Amino acid sequence: MASEVSVASSGSEHSGAQKCPFQDPGLSSMDQDSRLRDILSRFNREKIPERAVHARGAGAYGEFEVTHDVSDICDIDMLLGVGKKTPCVVRFSTTTLERGSAESVRDVKGMAIKHFTQDGNWDWVCLNIPMFFIRDPSKFPDMVHAQRPDPTTNVANPSRWWEFVCNNHETLHMVMFQFSDFGTMFDYRSMSGYAAHAYKWVMPDGSWKYVHWFLASDQGPNFETGHQAKQIGADDAESATRDLYQSLERGEYPSWTVKVQVVDPEDAPKLPFNILDVTKHWNLGNYPPDIDVIPGRTLGKLTLKKEPQDYFEEIEQLAFSPSRLVHGVEASEDPMLQARLFAYPDAQKHRLGPNNLDLPANRTKKFADGARPEKAEMAPQKVPSQEHADWVSQVKSSSWSEPNETDYKFPREFWKALPRLRGEAFQNSLVVNMAKSVSQVPVDMREKVYSTLALIADDLADRVRTMTEEIVE
């Protein structure tokens, strides 16, 4: 039998047939071979806990380049100076399912960017849909569990998700996106990313603006129907990762145009919805037609150019958090954002250990090119009006978790706008996708779903009911 060579953690080579030599027949190899124990113990411990959410992912390196002057609205070094380039790493992901799940499943997709700026690391933690399911962070664990397999059988159970939706109507806007073909984006390159939350950009004089940034894919959207996505998943569970890496190897570097929406704090209370409510999007002019348009202002371009050489060390050990901000950026009062400021670093301490920021993937590169001049102290933030203070207090009121009319208005206007924005087939696909899911739940739950959808639009509820009952029969 040919001799094989194993390498212990010390780096020393160890020869022996099947790597299990015996020096004394009276003693076990475990007693004889400390290197074997080393090899086995390393194998037993080589995997780290997977992420609680966004477990399945892929990543690549690139750079962000400033293409437009935005010095009038920000004092962020990375964004000051047309032509300035900042290295970054991007991780794409699915959200609720496990690390080994197919990338084509109906799921919200994540796009997290770590910018290695001269002021430290600045993380953008984005989704491919510009809103979220809930605005009350205490509901987050139940929301995630409702989308996971049934703990009794470990089999998917749509009743759990529809029960959550019917009891939490603020989810309806996001649910409409999830069950449209937005929920089955085919590849990461064609996916846009949205911060979803409001942040604050603070100027040296203490003045500030609410902002929401997003990345629009220059490759354009690439949707698949539910049937196509299911077939892709069966044929290639890693389809999106493979597409990303193959494009980089061909020299086809995907890019995204980065834009920001800006709201003055004195104007925020005048808007017909609360921009601190992450279940709503900042209207770019698509819908609702009677809500103020908040235009996007171009900042720059993000381009991916290089795939990782060691996925575990370079991508799996990445630790992103919306709390990783730089000079000139602050978190808003959005309760979901405030909860994430704690939850992300806490999860990373569990997954990667307390010193996870010292790992090469997460280490800052600031001052790498020499000492950097100290930034001038910023003036205290200017205090907005009492009207603004009263508006902010809404997020702390008991009514924040309760349904309100905008929870139905936004999904209703999305439903009505779909034929104009994407075509009749896109709207019909939403009905088909919902019906396939609802047809798997008991009759009493189906009736509850129809009643909930009727709060959005009667024709939506009627069409889902008709198709669902046809499937059931």
Curated annotation (Swiss-Prot):
Its EC number is 1.11.-.-. InterPro entries: Catalase, Catalase_AS, Catalase_clade1/3, Catalase_core, Catalase_haem_BS, Catalase_sf. Pathway: Alkaloid biosynthesis; ergot alkaloid biosynthesis. Residues 1-15 have a biased composition (Low complexity). Heme binds at residue 344. GO terms for molecular function: catalase activity; heme binding; metal ion binding. The active site is at residue 54. PROSITE patterns: CATALASE_1, CATALASE_2, CATALASE_3. It is an enzyme of class 1 (oxidoreductase). It holds the Pfam family Catalase. GO terms for cellular component: mitochondrion; peroxisome. Gene3D superfamilies: Catalase core domain. Residues 1-31, 369-388 are annotated as: Disordered. One of its GO terms (biological process) is hydrogen peroxide catabolic process. Catalase; part of the gene cluster that mediates the biosynthesis of fungal ergot alkaloid. DmaW catalyzes the first step of ergot alkaloid biosynthesis by condensing dimethylallyl diphosphate (DMAP) and tryptophan to form 4-dimethylallyl-L-tryptophan. The second step is catalyzed by the methyltransferase easF that methylates 4-dimethylallyl-L-tryptophan in the presence of S-adenosyl-L-methionine, resulting in the formation of 4-dimethylallyl-L-abrine. Belongs to the catalase family. This is Catalase easC. It comes from Claviceps purpurea.
